[in-house]
Amino acid sequence: TPGLFSQRELIELPLEDIPDTEYSFPLPGGKVISPYGRGRGRHSGIDIKTYAKDTIRSAFNGVVRMSKSYSAYGNVVVVRHDFGLETIYSHNFKNLVHCGDTVKAGQPIALTGRTGRASTEHLHFETRVNGQHFDPNIIFNMKEQTLNRQRIGCSKKGNGIVVQQLPTIYPKPLQKKYPMELFKYPNVSLHLQNVSLKERIEL
């Protein structure tokens, strides 16, 4: 969601306040086969594997901002959530939702595949704020496949972002829930080259 920091210095992700019914591990039962930050290209997400055509689920309530075939991502779904968070699901065999659809946490949105640049059937999962990817392990405990109950703060630093844990008891938030309608863009782009506030994506 580029442009968030033109309105706020700190984007707060209050994970501790999200009810159990409003989050879902994106690929239940899956195993992480490639971690975030792997390799010289800095892996922009994590790769999770179960079996071909397994059900991929939306991590949180949100609105689908992209659902199409896109370069090395293959079939990809981008979901925009409250608080400026976006999640990305790619290499899908088939997308089950369309751009503009409202989705609930745990709702099936795609089936695992190996479209795009992928050597095996799996889910490439990313978390982003302001168009910048960060480690999904901050959001989810990958071993337990549960939500990390903490309060996260995202701030701008140069062309990137800094993501850090905030105290449980924190002064009055600099922002509350972002209405998703506040950030309407005609297009959503997962740039594969360095432009403005985007980092190069290496799958």
Give the location of each predicted region.
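Polar/charged, compositionally biased leader and regulatory segments
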Residues: 1-35, 145-203
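Short glycine/threonine/proline-enriched tight-turn/helix- or strand-capping micro-motif at secondary-structure
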Residues: 12-15, 29-58
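A structural micro-motif recognizing beta-strand termini
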Residues: 22, 35, 49-53, 61, ...
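A residue-level detector for short acidic-glycine micro-motifs
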Residues: 34, 50, 66, 91-94, ...
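Short polar/acidic secondary-structure junctions
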Residues: 37-39, 53-55, 69-70, 102, ...
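Short, well-structured beta-strand-loop connectors
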Residues: 55-66, 97-112
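Zn2+-dependent peptidoglycan hydrolase active-site motif and core
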Residues: 58-96, 126
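Conserved, short, structured surface segments that act as functional micro-motifs
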Residues: 81, 101-158, 162-163, 170
